[in-house]
């Protein structure tokens, strides 16, 4: 299992759920999830993207199941992934007609590791309870867990209207925003209670309550966490593109995780046109790793640069090493157990360079502006070499690779511990 640190505070106690062999809740490490954006009926494209997400570190992948062609493709996607040695659990994302698709395509129902149900659009009026029941009964039949995923963009309007009407009769009515938050929480809890009444075990239910506002997300999940002990999936829906989406998701989920709330997360980023879908996995890992909850890839500490570091050498070296470490992690996780705990320092001048490098497992202090063109390298806190000339970057990269082999390879120091 990927390394992780103990939470520095009590985590919320939740009921553990097995999702295709991945433990969610019950004290297990926070799980990183992702979702494809391919047409699921396009088997080649979907298999390729699931494989890429899994290689990037996604531990559960959700796929859209929106029509017969998609449902028919699911078992073939699962089979292809198995042949490739990719055992990542697949979650079926169902809206509107999930009850029909699961009934008409039993092979799909069996191939999926979990079903996502949206109580806001599982059915309407007199069909709602019946169609919700149909999906839950399919989950029971195939021994699958479900995520009851409430989203304020498709919130149960009957429930919201009733709560709004009740609120008007109060002496001190809540704001519309507060009522909406309460409707989201109630939708999740009432749906979970109904699923249990149908016969689904508590260890088969995960809840989520997604909104697009940071303060709304914090308020909704804080309330949900106090009123339910079901495992919780965190996500800020419609977070947006680029740095805006990253900052918003990290701000909201960071606060919740720090309070011990959250058993699995997804960073929902709007990708650039033809952008890399694995970016959301990387950001989720970096959030958990930065907060000290899990360790996925070696840390590269690098200074931000200042007037003493007019050269771009240290920036390029830090970027190259970080990219190389992440690229090799799918293989290194198996080949070098524990390598995710490695810390590398790439510093740009003499002010903090030697000290930061000594704190790392292996670090280099490159010369700043006007400094002697030499670069001391520190290994395990001690000066191990001084690099000179035009090949400093290449020489250090080789030293990092050699250090990993010596420390984490078979017969290495870490393997012997």
Swiss-Prot record:
The keyword 4Fe-4S applies. InterPro entries: Dihydropteroate_synth-like_sf (IPR011005), IspG_bac (IPR016425), IspG_bac-typ (IPR004588), NO2/SO3_Rdtase_4Fe4S_sf (IPR045854). Pathway: Isoprenoid biosynthesis; isopentenyl diphosphate biosynthesis via DXP pathway; isopentenyl diphosphate from 1-deoxy-D-xylulose 5-phosphate: step 5/6. GO terms for biological process: isopentenyl diphosphate biosynthetic process, methylerythritol 4-phosphate pathway; terpenoid biosynthetic process. Binds 1 [4Fe-4S] cluster. [4Fe-4S] cluster binds at residues 303, 306, 349, 356. The keyword ATP-binding does not apply. It catalyses: (2E)-4-hydroxy-3-methylbut-2-enyl diphosphate + oxidized [flavodoxin] + H2O + 2 H(+) = 2-C-methyl-D-erythritol 2,4-cyclic diphosphate + reduced [flavodoxin]. Its cofactor is [4Fe-4S] cluster. GO terms for molecular function: 4 iron, 4 sulfur cluster binding; 4-hydroxy-3-methylbut-2-en-1-yl diphosphate synthase activity (ferredoxin); 4-hydroxy-3-methylbut-2-enyl-diphosphate synthase activity (flavodoxin); iron ion binding. Keywords: 4Fe-4S, Iron, Iron-sulfur, Isoprene biosynthesis, Metal-binding, Oxidoreductase. PANTHER family: 4-HYDROXY-3-METHYLBUT-2-EN-1-YL DIPHOSPHATE SYNTHASE (PTHR30454), 4-HYDROXY-3-METHYLBUT-2-EN-1-YL DIPHOSPHATE SYNTHASE (FERREDOXIN), CHLOROPLASTIC (PTHR30454:SF0). Converts 2C-methyl-D-erythritol 2,4-cyclodiphosphate (ME-2,4cPP) into 1-hydroxy-2-methyl-2-(E)-butenyl 4-diphosphate. This is 4-hydroxy-3-methylbut-2-en-1-yl diphosphate synthase (flavodoxin). It comes from Mesorhizobium japonicum (strain LMG 29417 / CECT 9101 / MAFF 303099). The lineage of its organism: Bacteria, Pseudomonadati, Pseudomonadota, Alphaproteobacteria, Hyphomicrobiales.
């Amino acid at each position: 299992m990927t390394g992780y640190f103990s939470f520095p505070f009590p985590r919320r106690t939740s009921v553990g759920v097995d999702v295709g062999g991945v433990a969610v809740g019950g004290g297990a490490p926070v799980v990183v999830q992702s979702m494809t954006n391919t047409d699921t009926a396009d088997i080649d494209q979907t298999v390729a993207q699931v494989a890429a997400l899994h290689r990037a570190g996604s531990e559960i992948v959700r796929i859209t199941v929106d029509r017969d062609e998609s449902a028919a493709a699911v078992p073939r996607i699962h089979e292809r992934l198995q042949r490739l040695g990719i055992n990542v659990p697949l979650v079926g994302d169902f809206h509107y007609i999930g009850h029909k698709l699961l009934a008409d395509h039993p092979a799909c129902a069996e191939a999926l590791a979990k079903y996502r149900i949206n109580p806001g659009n599982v059915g309407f009026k007199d069909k709602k309870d019946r169609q919700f029941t149909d999906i839950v009964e399919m989950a029971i039949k195939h021994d699958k867990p479900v995520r009851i995923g409430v989203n304020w963009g498709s919130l149960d309007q009957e429930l919201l209207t009733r709560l709004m009407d009740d609120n008007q009769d109060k002496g001190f009515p809540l704001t519309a925003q507060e009522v909406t938050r309460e409707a989201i929480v109630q939708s999740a809890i009432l749906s979970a209670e109904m699923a249990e009444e149908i016969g689904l075990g508590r260890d088969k239910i995960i809840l989520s309550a997604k909104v697009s506002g940071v303060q709304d997300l914090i308020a909704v999940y804080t309330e949900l966490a106090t009123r339910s002990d079901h495992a919780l999936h965190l996500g800020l829906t419609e977070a947006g593109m680029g740095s805006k989406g990253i900052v918003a998701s990290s701000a909201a989920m960071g606060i919740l995780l720090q309070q011990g709330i959250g058993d699995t997360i997804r960073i929902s980023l709007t990708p650039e046109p033809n952008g890399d879908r694995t970016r959301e996995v990387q950001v989720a890992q970096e959030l958990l790793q930065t907060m000290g909850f899990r360790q996925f890839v070696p840390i590269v500490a690098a200074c931000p640069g200042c007037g003493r570091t007019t050269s771009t050498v240290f920036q390029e070296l830090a970027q190259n090493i970080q990219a190389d470490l992440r690229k090799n992690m799918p293989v290194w996780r198996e080949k070098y157990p524990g390598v995710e705990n490695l810390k590398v320092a790439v510093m740009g001048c003499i002010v903090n360079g030697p000290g930061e490098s000594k704190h790392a497992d292996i670090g280099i202090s490159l010369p700043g502006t006007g400094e002697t063109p030499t670069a001391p390298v520190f290994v395990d806190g001690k000066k191990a070499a001084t690099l000179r000339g035009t090949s400093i970057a290449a020489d250090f990269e080789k030293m990092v690779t050699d250090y990993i082999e010596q420390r984490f390879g078979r017969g290495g120091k870490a393997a012997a511990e």
